[in-house]
Amino acid sequence: MLLATDLDGTFLGGDPKDRLSLYQTIAAHPEIRLAYVTGRSLESVLPLLADPTLPQPDFIISDVGASLVHGDSLQPIQPLQSAVDALWPGDSQVASAIERFALERQDVPQVRRCSYFCNPEQAANPELLTIAESLGCDLLYSAERYLDFLPKGVNKGSSLQALIDWLELDNDQVLTAGDTLNDLSMLSGQFKGVCVGASEPGLLQATRQYSLVFHAERAGCGGILEAFVHFGFLGKQGIAAEGKQVAEPGKADLMMVYHRLPYEEFRGADGKLQRRRPTSPNGIIPTLLSFFGDGRAGSWVAWAEHDENSGETFDSHTTVDAERYPKLTAARVALSKEEVDIFYKRFSKEAFWPTLHTFWERGQFREDDWQVFLKVNRAFAERTALEAAEGATVWLHDYNLWMVPGYLRELRPDLRIAFFHHTYFPSADVFNVLPWRRQIIGSLLQCDYIGFHIPRQVENFVDAARGVMPLQTVSRQNCAPRFITYGCAVGLERMTTAVDTGNRVVKLGAHPVGLDIERVRSALAAPKIREMMERLRSELAGVKLILSVERLDYTKGILEKLNAYERLLEENPELLGKVTLVTVCVPAAKEMTIYDELQGQIEQAVGRINGRFARIGWTPLQFFFRSLPFEEVSAWYAMADVMWITPLRDGLNLVAKEFVAAQGLLDGRGVLVLSEFAGAAAELKGALLTNPHDPVDMTQTCYVALNMPKAEAQARLRELFDIVNYNDIRRWGDEFLAAVSDPQEQLDRALGLVG
């Protein structure tokens, strides 16, 4: 069958439960083809295609019948569209002909039609009809204020009939639905039709004579559901035979949905899978776990690799730590090795990572990979829907799970969905390079709350979202004093804190991830680390240490930094023998071959610099191309005179905070030189900011740091440590969850209603 429905007041209207029921019914029955038949322009329909809760149409008839396109490709349905095109005289001819009437043009997109605001008195002027006929146009007047000039003989009904003939469907296989006189042409008795509840009186009056037109009681989608029953679609019992329901709730009050399990899995000597506490210095996992320390019932959803042909039993649920978190379980999503490679290692890093960090020209966008990404995100959503209690809070993490909110909202509309974007979010012109931007934004806007590190990233997201669908700003707030406004490239004066999508209000916030200060304190207190610091202090006597710690990645600006260091030594020969740069570069996984060329370029630069400037007893550059234990890195932090962090783009940069913590805990006076394109630059007042895209500025800023007076260095570090120590990772988690769980208070704060 074909369901041909008007949108506003019909397919988009009615009780939320009726809407969900109808949408799920359509999704469950692929034999139901869907056509949007609307007075909106095609451009105004596009935002709906980004809404994952709406069934996507097979066909779209827009502009009151003047535009006909395929729902998937948005390409014209030919030859139907060409037939309409031939009937249209052109916008300028219509505008010129009615210029003396001083009608106000509607400020909405219009194609092959001209739409005006017109009062009943103006509409009654017979000259308008005469002009329309002379142009070869029809006039359509609706709702006592809208006047449309349309191609002769073209309306919703005529275009729908042309589509049905083109599809070679019997009219008996069609159900039409509408609510205003604008829909009369497709509710004139040639098809089974429904005037949904609360329809325009004029439409009800005009259709009473038609036996095939049913007048429903319930509004919007509820009326369409009534029509399914009335006409016996989907069998004799109609919609009553449908058994699809919203997923039954689980028991978890708080859901963590993360790409990593809260423990590490490894193979023991016997080849069996074993588990242990995380050994990574990542402080986020312990913090997220801490929310379950009070006995709160929760579930942690993450993927685990599993070979279906291995013969091993897959444990979908495991305990995390029975003593510390007695009511927390890990809900594991089984992924094959191929799915892991595509979803996590290849697609996310080759398509999304470069685009998010503004290196879109490096992106590789494969539709097959996108389909795997959707499949995995759907699996995450289904697992979450099964675990979550009624009204539970779901906390999703990062771009790997972009599409989960959309799927989850459909499965469990009762849930409170929160998303934290750990990675940088670029400006709209960069993000829009992604072929799937509409689907991604549409999914994220199903959240109740979305958090980013800094205000600039919040605003970038809002700009990208505005390019997908119309948004109304609900509230904004000043970024100061928490964040720098005009003092860095990623600063901002005001940010949006809530937007209205038309279906929901989405709250937004800036929450820079904090540091686990106790982990740094513990590392520095270890006897072997104290011995290491003493050894380094002796080895570096008379030499200033510049430290650089980063992963091997083109976003980190490693080559740019090495070139700036070479310039520093060239222009300041008095530094030879007096300064050394130690770079710790963590290699990428073996499968990440996209970094091979960069690694070669870095190795050449290191060799060139040491070859040019090295002396007996002094090496200008020490390069560690390996991962060092966090405790050892902490010792280097404590000994550094200058910490040189110069990513070309970064969501935040926790290394900067680790350096500040190590120095602050030991009353040091190291200087932080930080890229102004790192998210942390908007938060860490006291850092020396540098532009990694400007070689001269890079060199000069490093030189200033090396020669900074002790008093200034100490003052800057005190300011930095105060920020890092106060806004630690525990505060980050508490504030984020508070914003999610009490959105009204968050909104009141944004509006300045509370202190």
UniProtKB/Swiss-Prot annotation:
Top-level taxon: Bacteria
Sorted UniProt keywords: Glycosyltransferase, Transferase
EC number of this enzyme: 2.4.1.213
GO biological process, alphabetically ordered: glucosylglycerol biosynthetic process; trehalose biosynthetic process
Molecular function in Gene Ontology: alpha,alpha-trehalose-phosphate synthase (UDP-forming) activity; glucosylglycerol-phosphate synthase activity; magnesium ion binding; phosphatase activity
Catalysed reactions, semicolon-separated: ADP-alpha-D-glucose + sn-glycerol 3-phosphate = 2-O-(alpha-D-glucopyranosyl)-sn-glycerol 3-phosphate + ADP + H(+)
Biological or metabolic pathway of the protein: Glycan metabolism; glucosylglycerol biosynthesis
Alphabetical list of InterPro entries matching this protein: Gluc_glyc_Psyn (IPR012764), Glyco_trans_20 (IPR001830), HAD-like_sf (IPR036412), HAD-SF_hydro_IIB (IPR006379), HAD_sf (IPR023214), SPP-like_dom (IPR006380)
Family: Belongs to the glycosyltransferase 20 family.
Entry function: Involved in salt tolerance by producing GG-phosphate from ADP-glucose and glycerol-3-phosphate (G3P), an intermediate in the synthesis of the osmolyte glucosylglycerol (GG).
Name by which UniProt lists this protein: Glucosylglycerol-phosphate synthase
Taxonomic source organism: Pseudomonas anguilliseptica
Gene this protein is translated from: ggpS
